[in-house]
Structures are given as structure tokens and as C-alpha cells.
């Protein structure tokens, strides 16, 4: 990293870690020793190289054994940190509770550690005189099932995220601490990673020394069933798709399907121009056993898809834009990075104020590039956009909570289930953020007479300094300045009114769709995208009629705030038993809603929740309602232009 880029973060870190003595004055911990202040990180090389040897062969118990050797240069108190603020997660999610049997020795003698009482991911030890290194060992107890966390090891594959299985010395920038890792895999397994391999013999991979900053950003997917696909043959820098699967048959991708993924790489090059990596590795798990994931890294990404992703791609609509989204993050989020997320260590809190760019614009470009590449048709993308427009345009939560505030959700909610999602709002900066960028794109196209677009912003903002992968921070003012260079406007007001508005000022975010030549309408049949997607997931949608969604067992999974179901006192968890005297099914529910249209006959529904039964009568008569985008005659099809593949 460039020192100037981290100056503000260094000052913040000094305030955070330097506050320890003051905190001690509030109350002294009842421990057998004094806690030393955690040193603020400094931009100086850590003396020596930390070795980390990982054994991931215990598949039955899913236990990973880790051994580290950490050089030290003097006696006295020392703090080792377990990463807490994991890049890409946008919150303090480092699972320190998964670490067990922590042992630390020096010169063969055990050293007793004590956990820091304020920064509980920190472990303090006393380095004895004459010691030149600490030997650290522990077990990473990975989840056995999903109730304990995301499953990262199965009998056929594993997902190593190094930052979940390491300790590092406090007091130094992550970019200034060097690790030398090795990984032992089960016999016969192969792997993909952005790390540079020095050797791989008898199941032991030895990787080149790397800074902690990049080490934590370079996970591994490994498995018994592995395939690597070149997505840019003869290109300027390698782009590879590393696939692991539950079964070897799941690796059977057809050449036309692979070509669509190659077109994704081509369309990204045409959009951005520059590349900010020396090689890029998609890590892809085709599995229903490994925990689901879509997580960006600078030179790789972690992705998991349905087991039919290659063998029956038409049945995996929900996975279509995943790789595109994570690939875009190499430019937006990893190379260009919000300044308040560019922290010097993995334990300093990040701030999320620009996630509507980091994630929102990535969501936008991910869907656009997926469509331009042909992985998604224009018709299906318009259906997806209709669902997004309906969800956020009619969100009851807009009455009280600004979209800007939702950037804090990864910190305050951490993706826990919500009782009333439509009112609480969640990580709306993804999809509503994408609507804002569609608004900006169509406005630029309209005002410039079609001569300029958000593509020009992408080229100017991300398409410079080709080959550089030193993070380049950005601020709100940088965004505004670049937009103004593309098409003059009061962009600060344009953006802030959309980000900060609540209540009566929170207009439905549909201007981009209408300026794009379409309008949101509701019809009695789901659009093709929604029909296919909900068929995959076993979901049934009556959100815009009765205000409920149900699963394949007729159990209500969500209730829309202020809907007929809400007014009737229903919540998620109720099972629909019967409708109008007939056994419940999605078809029966839909038929009852249709039969009540335009008359006064109520819809009678019997429901069960545990041992409780109740009957509800809905005085609803507007029929089934599903979102669609309808072409506005006589207007330019700017959405069509946006989604069309680029030829130069």
C-alpha cells in the first residue's frame, strides 16, 4: 500500500489503540496481570517472516491444525491479534470463538496468555528474555453444520480463509507483516488460489512469502473433484476458473457455456479497459454441501453455485450474475476502495458510508456485464429489474429510514433474520444502490444525446493505471468530480437527495427505469425471471396482493408491512392449511385471489402455527399482482442500449 493513502487510517488507529490506558481508568480488570496498551499500528516492516503451517486433512471432524512461528526481537509484553474486521464482510465478523487449544511457547517453555478485556480478539503474552521466536499452535474448529456457522469443509472439498486461522503481532500495518504459508491437503486433492505456489508435492503446498494484507485476501478452494478452465486464452494476464464439485460429473461444462464466461471477461475489459491484477482466479464450488458464499478479493473471488450450474444451466437462474458481481469487485471495492474502508490492520473498524458505490455500483455492473455477455437474456434481466423496482419502490421502510443508513446493516444486524424486513430495511444499498446508478446512467445518456454514459465513468474511474493493484481510495467528492467530467450536473445534490431522503421526500427510485424507456406495471402472471427463479427456490409470491410469500410447504416466510396479511395479524411461521375450504397449495391460493377479483366475496384462509389454529378472512379484490417492465412507446430504449454487448 502507498503510505499516503493510509495516513488518515493510521491516525484513526492511533486514536483507537492509544485509548487503552484511558479505558483502564474507568475500571481495572480483575486479572492476575496488568494489560499493556495495544500498540497503534505503524508503517514499518515487521522484523522477520512469520511461518504458518496448516493441516486440513482431518475431514471427518473438520478440524484444521495450525502452527505458526513468529519472530520476536525483545522481551516484554506482546499482543497477538486475531482478525476481526474482515474485508468484504463490512462488519466485525471474525469468528475468534472457532479457535481452540491455543498454545504459545518460547524456547520450548509454555507462555500463559490472557485475552484483552476490551479488544477481545487480542491475546497478551510476556516474551521472555533471550527469546527469538514464538511457537504458536491452535485448532480451527470449523462448523460441522450450518447452525454453527458457514460450513467450509466437506468430505469432498474445503474452503480455506486464512484470516480465520491466524494470529499476527499488533503494532504494524498488515501490509508490513510477511507470512510464509504451507497447506497440507488430503491425498489426491487439487486446489485453486491467487497465492503463488512454490511447490506442491505429496499433498503439501508451499506458497511464496506474502504480506498479511494480501495473504488474508487470497483464500483457497480445494477438492477431490477439481477442474481449471482458462477464461482468457492468450490474454494479457491469466484469468482462471477453478472449480471444485461434490461429484466429478458436476464438472462437465459444455464449451458454449464456457464461452459465455469468457465473454464476461471480454465485456469487463471493454468496460474498464485496465486490469488491476497480475492474474485472477475465480474459485467456484459446485455444491449443496459447502456453505454458500459470494465474496470478493482483489485477485480472486469465492463463489458457490447450485449442483446443476454446468450440467443444467437453465435451471440455475439465481446463480447467473454471481461471477460477474464478484469480478467487478476487483475494480470497485478492491482496487478503487472507499477511503473509510482502507484500514491499516484487520482489527481497526471499517466504516461503510460508500457501500452504495462499493456494492451498489458493483451490483449494477455485475448485472449489466452478465447480460452483455449472454449469461442472462435481456428479457430475464428486465424481469429481474422489475422485481427490484417493485421491492424498493414500494418499500414501507422508506417512510422512516434513509437508504444511506442501510450501509450500517452489516455491523448492526450482520444478516440475522428479520421479523419485518420490509419495514426494518436491510442491505438496501445493493439493489436500491443499483437503481440509483441506473438513474445516473440514463440521465447522462439523455443529457448527452446518447454520446456519453456511465460506461465513460467506469473507464475514467477504474480504467486507469493499468497493472497497478495498490489500493486507490475514493471519497464522495471523487465520485462527484468524475461524474461531472463525464456530464456536468449538480451530482452532489443528485446523489444526496436519493441517498438521504425519507418519508414524503423519498420518491420511488424509478426515474432510471422510466428514462430508460420502460414503466413498472403489475400483471396477473409472474414475469419469466420471477417464474423461473421462484421455481428454483420453491418460493411462491403473493407480496403485492395479500402481502405474503410462502415456501413449498405453504408456510409463510414473510409478511409485507401494511398489507392485508399484516392487517389480519399474520406473521412469518404460519402454515396455510386451507383456502376457501380446499386444501392449501400455491395454485389454490392463486385461484382464490383471482376468484375474489372485482367482487365482494372474501378470501377465507385457515392457518396453523404450532398447536394454534385460526381462520382469517381477507377483504381483498384486486387479483394477483406481479411486477413487469412495460415499454413506453415513442421513447428511446436506453435500457436496451445499456444491456447490449459492447463490440469495441
Pin down the residues of each PLM region.
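Extended catalytic-interface subdomain
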Residues: 328-330, 357-379, 388
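Envelope-exposed proteins and targeting segments
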Residues: 48, 62-64, 100, 132, ...
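Non-catalytic architectural context of zinc metalloproteases
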Residues: 44-46, 57, 63, 67-69, ...
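Juxtacatalytic substrate-recognition/specificity segment
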Residues: 68, 230-355, 361, 365
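Gram-negative bacterial Sec-dependent N-terminal signal peptides
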Residues: 3-23
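N-terminal, polar/Ser/Thr-rich
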Residues: 25-59
Amino acid at each position: 500500500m502507498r503510505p499516503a493513502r493510509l495516513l488518515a487510517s493510521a491516525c484513526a488507529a492511533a486514536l483507537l489503540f492509544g485509548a487503552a490506558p484511558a479505558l483502564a481508568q474507568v475500571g481495572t480488570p480483575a486479572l492476575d496481570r496488568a494489560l499493556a496498551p495495544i500498540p497503534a499500528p505503524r508503517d514499518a516492516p515487521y522484523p522477520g517472516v512469520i511461518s504458518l503451517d496448516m493441516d486440513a486433512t482431518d475431514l471427518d471432524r473438520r478440524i484444521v491444525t495450525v502452527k505458526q512461528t513468529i519472530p520476536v526481537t525483545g522481551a516484554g509484553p506482546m499482543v497477538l491479534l486475531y482478525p476481526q474486521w474482515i474485508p468484504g464482510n463490512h462488519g466485525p465478523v471474525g469468528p475468534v470463538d472457532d479457535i481452540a487449544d491455543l498454545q504459545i511457547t518460547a524456547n520450548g517453555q509454555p507462555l500463559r496468555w490472557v485475552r484483552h478485556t476490551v479488544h477481545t480478539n487480542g491475546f497478551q503474552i510476556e516474551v521472555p528474555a533471550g527469546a527469538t521466536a514464538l511457537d504458536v499452535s491452535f485448532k480451527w474448529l470449523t462448523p460441522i453444520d450450518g447452525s454453527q456457522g458457514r460450513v467450509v469443509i466437506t468430505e469432498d472439498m474445503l474452503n480455506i480463509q486464512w484470516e480465520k486461522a491466524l494470529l499476527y503481532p499488533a503494532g504494524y500495518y498488515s501490509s508490513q507483516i510477511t507470512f510464509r504459508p504451507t497447506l497440507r491437503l488430503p491425498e489426491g486433492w487439487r486446489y485453486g488460489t491467487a497465492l503463488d505456489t512454490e511447490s506442491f508435492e505429496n499433498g503439501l503446498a508451499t506458497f511464496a512469502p506474502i504480506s498479511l494484507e494480501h495473504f488474508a485476501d487470497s483464500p483457497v478452494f480445494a477438492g477431490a473433484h477439481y477442474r481449471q478452465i482458462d477464461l482468457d486464452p492468450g490474454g494479457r494476464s491469466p484469468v482462471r476458473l477453478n472449480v471444485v464439485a461434490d461429484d466429478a460429473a458436476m464438472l462437465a461444462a459444455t464449451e458454449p457455456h464456457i464461452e459465455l464466461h469468457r465473454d464476461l471477461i471480454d465485456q469487463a475489459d471493454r468496460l474498464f479497459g485496465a486490469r488491476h491484477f497480475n492474474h485472477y482466479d475465480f474459485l467456484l464450488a459446485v455444491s449443496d454441501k459447502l456453505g454458500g458464499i459470494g465474496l470478493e478479493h482483489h485477485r480472486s473471488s469465492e463463489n458457490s453455485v447450485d449442483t446443476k450450474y454446468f450440467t443444467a444451466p437453465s435451471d440455475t437462474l439465481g446463480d447467473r450474475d454471481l461471477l460477474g458481481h464478484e469480478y467487478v469487485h476487483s475494480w470497485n471495492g478492491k482496487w478503487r476502495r472507499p477511503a473509510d474502508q482502507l484500514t491499516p490492520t484487520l482489527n481497526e473498524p471499517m466504516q461503510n458510508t460508500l457501500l452504495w458505490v462499493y456494492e451498489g455500483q458493483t451490483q449494477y455492473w455485475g448485472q449489466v456485464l452478465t447480460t452483455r455477455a449472454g449469461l442472462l437474456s435481456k428479457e430475464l434481466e428486465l424481469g429481474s429489474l422489475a422485481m427490484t423496482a417493485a421491492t424498493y419502490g414500494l418499500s414501507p421502510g422508506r417512510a422512516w429510514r434513509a437508504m444511506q443508513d442501510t450501509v450500517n446493516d452489516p455491523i448492526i444486524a450482520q444478516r440475522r433474520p428479520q421479523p419485518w424486513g420490509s419495514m426494518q430495511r436491510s442491505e438496501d444499498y445493493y439493489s436500491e444502490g443499483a437503481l440509483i446508478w441506473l438513474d445516473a446512467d440514463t440521465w447522462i445518456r439523455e443529457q448527452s444525446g446518447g454520446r456519453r454514459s456511465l460506461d465513460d465513468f467506469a473507464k475514467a474511474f477504474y480504467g486507469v493505471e493499468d497493472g497497478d493493484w495498490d489500493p486507490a481510495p475514493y471519497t464522495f467528492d471523487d465520485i462527484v468530480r468524475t461524474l461531472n467530467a463525464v456530464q456536468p450536473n449538480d451530482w452532489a445534490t443528485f446523489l444526496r437527495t436519493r441517498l438521504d431522503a425519507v418519508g414524503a421526500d423519498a420518491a420511488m427510485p424509478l426515474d432510471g427505469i422510466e428514462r430508460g424507456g420502460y414503466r413498472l406495471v403489475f400483471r396477473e402472471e409472474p414475469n419469466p425471471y420471477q417464474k423461473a427463479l421462484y421455481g428454483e427456490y420453491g418460493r411462491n409470491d403473493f407480496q403485492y396482493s395479500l402481502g405474503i410469500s410462502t415456501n413449498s410447504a405453504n408456510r409463510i416466510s414473510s409478511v409485507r408491512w401494511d398489507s392485508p396479511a399484516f392487517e389480519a395479524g399474520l406473521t412469518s411461521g404460519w402454515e396455510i392449511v386451507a383456502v376457501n375450504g380446499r386444501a392449501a397449495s400455491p395454485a389454490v391460493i392463486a385461484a382464490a385471489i383471482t376468484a375474489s377479483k372485482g367482487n365482494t366475496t372474501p378470501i377465507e384462509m385457515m392457518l396453523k402455527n404450532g398447536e394454534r389454529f385460526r381462520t382469517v378472512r381477507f377483504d381483498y379484490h384486486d387479483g394477483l399482482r406481479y411486477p413487469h417492465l412495460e415499454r413506453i412507446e415513442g421513447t428511446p430504449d436506453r435500457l436496451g442500449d445499456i444491456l447490449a454487448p459492447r463490440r469495441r
